């Protein structure tokens, strides 16, 4: 019965297909193989999209949607793009998270019976971009696969991640706990995530385009074997990946998908890096966001720490900087080696110094991405010429590095890495023209002298004019026809033209080709032979050039690993040189490291803020076992958050390997950096501002260790005063007594300034400010001891709050101060007045009420006064001021 049903279904499908034209049958077959992908179907000079694909592309790419004819009774909707401009349209699609299958004509239209043979040669997806037109120069694009591991009870026990930068061939693996997935994805920022049904729900929203792949692709045993095959090894022990489980399963799925999209092997994926959580300083999503490492809180790329540090001369260096900022090593050994290299670059003699080195680096091409395209056989002519010119410049660059490498082991290692693969430069120099065309199809790519056949074909095509001149001269002499001409047109090709009055002199070997009113056109055997050669020479030259170019790409494949080594060395050298330039230009110093717990920063500065203002006030920060928590008070806008962030940024920069903005800095071990600064509603997640705040605080309290640096800014402000105060007090105590981490704790709760009395490891500091008239001047200096008020009204006035509101607030504040003094209630926060202090006894009786002049001033509204009324009021106030409160009462 089942067989009959299958046969019926096949017959129905065959009947339906027969109703379509042969070309549409071909298209529909290809589309059925890529149902979730937009198929770009090559037709002559255009890529066409049909039916639903056409409608979608027209909407996303702003294309004209047309309708031409019908197939099987269905109108054919079409939209198309020129083949030479397809990359810009693909770039737009990728930004929308869409994928495209590029279907090319692979058959010869002249010999095809029916539709020209076509097939999909590559699939462009958000995570598999390699073409320069689709990539940002300074950002990597990652394809990530996610595999959930389960224990014997079927509960998720770990998550394996494998992510690939297809443009460079860098492959990384990691295994982590399920609750760490969000932080890992925030750090990696994949453009595309591969997941099987049942695990897609594990992916937080907004983390990249999600692609469903079959569950069997994630088989762990198959994935392990596929990794071994890809890396051409018998075991993964040398990469530290043999003990991995779910990560190897993820790697297997990733390699299957990536190879399928490219339609070929991934020849440049030849190494593997296993990332362990303990290897890097932990930075959770909140910390990355609040420290504005690579993106501001407003979502812009500048001003950030990345934008400040990125003076790299190559795109490779800029991309490496982004990676280093998000992966600061915990071990100080790597940072110290980088500091040593920076010092050597700064101390180098002028002829081999920093400026000379950076000038040479500016001539370097993006070797990393060119190598990726080489491995995928998609490198274009100018990629190869750029690679050739870069390799030609490497000997001089190596000499500069060698002159200063004796003072830094890291530079010596990089100098060795900059040696081009043997034979690679020679091949590129011989094969590629000095200034090749952009595309092989345009010709002029292969250098003269590389291939004799190509040179001959070019000579025929290029020397055509001279041959015709020589032939015309010879024929005039042979025939005695002085006005004989040898010419060419597209309709009749080459011909010899003779006027009617001279036709009696035409030799017997002339064959008539065309008769005109006043002339006859002929062709000779010699001219016919030349015509056959000339007309086909250019076409044959282009075909020969294409074949030779493909041969060059194949010949370069054995050099892929050597090119990758050079690219890695260039990127690191460029980044270290950029760090040195920043240190010299911005007056930064080399930090020191110690095994003792502590952070000491002398005259530290916020690197990004300092670059935005004319003058920046430097401040010290000292944290050690006797001083673990700083309670930071002071006015709003006084600089508390800036001081906290600059401490974290200076620590991060030190471990990344950069010099730091300070007079001196010394750091003990740091394992994680936490921030709880600012908050906003998570509407999508159904969480209020206070809930977000408490969630971040909980993560800190649960995970911070004695080696962690914690920034807490105004915790507890999202609820009632007493609740917030109680929470802030308890959190600060817990950080001191249990976590014992380095903590900067900013607050407006005055009661917390009493904490050092209970915990000697806590200390009070404040950001100073002075009142000037009714305004305030922020000094931005960190001083010992607590602040006594927050200057909230003055800050509101600076912010542009209307004057009537400020006056009303000032009046109500005076009322609250009187009420507070009368009831002797404790101060709840720094917006209130300072606590009442017992004054020594004096002979004068205390004032029972506020001064009458002040009361009169608070009653009036200056905006309602006429000039005459204002003058009268001035005399009245003068009189009240001369008399005391007692006189006024009398």
Curated annotation (Swiss-Prot):
Gene Ontology biological process terms, A to Z: mismatch repair
Protein name (database record): DNA mismatch repair protein MutS
Keyword DNA damage attributed: yes
A Gene Ontology term for the protein's cellular component: cytosol
Gene3D superfamilies: 1.10.1420.10, 6.10.140.430, DNA repair protein MutS, domain I, MutS, connector domain, P-loop containing nucleotide triphosphate hydrolases
Family matches, as SUPFAM superfamilies: DNA repair protein MutS, domain I, DNA repair protein MutS, domain II, DNA repair protein MutS, domain III, P-loop containing nucleoside triphosphate hydrolases
Keyword annotations: ATP-binding, DNA damage, DNA repair, DNA-binding, Nucleotide-binding
PROSITE patterns named among the record's database cross-references: DNA_MISMATCH_REPAIR_2
Protein purpose: This protein is involved in the repair of mismatches in DNA. It is possible that it carries out the mismatch recognition step. This protein has a weak ATPase activity.
Family note: Belongs to the DNA mismatch repair MutS family.
Superkingdom, taxonomy of origin: Bacteria
HAMAP family to which the protein is assigned, alphabetical: MutS
Signal sequence annotation: none
Cross-referenced InterPro entries: DNA_mismatch_repair_MutS (IPR005748), DNA_mismatch_repair_MutS-lik_N (IPR007695), DNA_mismatch_repair_MutS/MSH (IPR017261), DNA_mismatch_repair_MutS_C (IPR000432), DNA_mismatch_repair_MutS_clamp (IPR007861), DNA_mismatch_repair_MutS_core (IPR007696), DNA_mismatch_repair_MutS_N (IPR016151), DNA_mismatch_repair_MutS_sf (IPR036187)
Species in which this protein is naturally found: Burkholderia pseudomallei (strain K96243)
């Amino acid at each position: 019965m089942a067989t009959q049903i299958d046969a019926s279904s096949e017959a129905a499908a065959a009947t339906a297909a027969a109703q379509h034209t042969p070309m549409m049958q071909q298209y529909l077959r290809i589309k059925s193989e890529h149902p979730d992908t937009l198929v770009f179907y090559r037709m002559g000079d255009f890529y066409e999209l049909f039916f639903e694909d056409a409608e979608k592309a027209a909407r996303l790419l702003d294309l004209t949607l047309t309708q031409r004819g019908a197939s099987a009774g269905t109108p054919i909707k079409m939209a198309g793009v020129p083949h030479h401009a397809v990359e810009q349209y693909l770039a737009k699609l990728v930004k929308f998270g869409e994928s495209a299958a590029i279907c090319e004509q692979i058959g010869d239209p002249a010999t095809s019976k029916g539709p020209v043979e076509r097939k999909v040669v590559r699939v462009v997806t958000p995570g598999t971009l390699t073409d320069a037109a689709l990539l940002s120069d300074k950002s990597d694009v990652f394809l990530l696969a996610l595999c959930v591991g389960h224990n014997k009870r079927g509960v998720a026990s770990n998550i394996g991640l494998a992510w690939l930068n297809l443009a460079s061939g860098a492959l990384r693996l990691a295994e982590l706990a399920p609750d760490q997935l969000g932080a890992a994805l925030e750090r990696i920022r994949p453009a595309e995530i591969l997941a099987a049904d049942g695990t897609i729900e594990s992916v937080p929203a907004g983390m990249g385009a999600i692609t469903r792949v079959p569950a069997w692709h994630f088989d762990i045993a198959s994935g392990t074997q596929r990794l071994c095959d890809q890396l051409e090894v018998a075991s993964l022990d040398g990469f530290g990946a043999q003990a991995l489980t779910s990560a190897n399963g993820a790697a297997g799925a990733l390699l299957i998908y990536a190879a399928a999209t490219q339609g070929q092997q991934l020849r440049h994926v030849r190494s593997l890096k296993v990332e362990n959580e303990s290897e890097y300083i932990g930075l959770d999503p909140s910390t990355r966001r609040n420290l504005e490492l690579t993106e501001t809180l407003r979502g812009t790329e500048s001003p950030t720490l990345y934008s400040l540090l990125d003076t790299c001369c190559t795109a490779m260096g800029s991309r490496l900087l982004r990676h280093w900022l998000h992966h600061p090593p915990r071990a100080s050994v790597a940072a110290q080696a980088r500091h040593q290299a920076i010092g050597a670059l700064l101390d180098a003699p002028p002829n081999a110094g920093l400026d000379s080195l950076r000038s040479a680096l500016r001539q370097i091409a993006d070797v990393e991405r060119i190598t990726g395209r080489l491995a995928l056989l998609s490198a274009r002519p100018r990629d190869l010429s750029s690679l050739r010119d870069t390799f030609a410049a490497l000997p001089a660059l190596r000499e500069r590095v060698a002159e200063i490498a004796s003072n830094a082991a890291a530079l010596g290692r990089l100098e060795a890495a900059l040696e081009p693969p043997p034979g690679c430069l020679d091949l590129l120099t011989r094969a590629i023209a000095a200034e090749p065309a952009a595309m092989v199809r345009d010709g002029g790519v292969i250098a003269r002298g590389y291939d004799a056949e190509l040179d001959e074909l070019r000579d025929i095509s290029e020397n055509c004019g001279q041959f015709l001149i020589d032939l015309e001269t010879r024929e005039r002499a042979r025939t005695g026809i002085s006005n004989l001409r040898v010419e060419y047109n597209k309709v009749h090709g080459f011909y010899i033209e003779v006027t009617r009055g001279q036709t009696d002199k035409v030799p017997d070997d002339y064959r008539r080709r065309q008769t005109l009113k006043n002339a006859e056109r002929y062709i000779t055997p010699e001219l016919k032979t030349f015509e056959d050669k000339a007309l086909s020479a250019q076409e044959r030259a282009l075909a020969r050039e294409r074949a030779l170019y493909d041969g060059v790409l194949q010949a370069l494949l054995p050099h892929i690993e050597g090119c990758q080594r050079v690219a890695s060395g260039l990127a690191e050298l460029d980044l270290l040189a950029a760090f040195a330039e920043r240190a010299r230009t911005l007056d930064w110093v080399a930090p020191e490291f110690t095994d003792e717990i502590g952070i000491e920063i002398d005259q530290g500065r916020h690197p990004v803020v300092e670059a935005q203002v004319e003058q920046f006030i430097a401040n010290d920060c000292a944290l050690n076992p006797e001083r673990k928590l700083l309670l930071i008070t002071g006015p709003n806008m006084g600089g508390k958050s800036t001081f906290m962030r600059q401490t974290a940024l200076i620590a991060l920069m030190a471990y990344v390997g950069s010099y730091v903005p300070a007079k001196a800095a010394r750091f003990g071990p740091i394992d994680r950096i936490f921030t709880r600064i600012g908050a906003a509603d998570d509407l999508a997640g159904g969480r209020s501002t206070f809930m977000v705040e408490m969630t971040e605080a909980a993560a800190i309290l649960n995970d911070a260790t004695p080696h962690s640096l914690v920034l807490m800014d105004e915790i507890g402000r999202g609820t009632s005063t007493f609740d917030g105060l109680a929470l802030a007090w308890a959190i600060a105590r817990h950080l001191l007594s249990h976590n014992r981490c380095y903590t900067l704790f900013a607050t407006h709760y005055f009661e917390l300034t009493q904490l050092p009395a209970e915990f000697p490891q806590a200390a009070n500091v404040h950001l100073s400010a002075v009142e000037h008239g009714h305004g305030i001047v922020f000094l931005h200096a960190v001083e010992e001891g607590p602040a006594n008020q927050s200057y909230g009204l003055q800050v509101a006035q600076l912010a542009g709050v209307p004057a009537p509101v400020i006056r009303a607030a000032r009046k109500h504040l005076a009322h609250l101060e009187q009420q507070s003094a009368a009831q002797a209630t404790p101060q709840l926060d720094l917006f209130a007045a300072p606590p009442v202090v017992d004054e020594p006894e004096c002979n004068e009786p205390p004032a029972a009420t506020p001064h009458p002049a002040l009361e009169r001033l608070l009653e009036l509204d200056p905006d309602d006064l006429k000039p005459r009324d204002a003058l009268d009021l001035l005399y009245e106030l003068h009189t009240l001021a001369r008399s005391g409160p007692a006189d006024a009462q009398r």
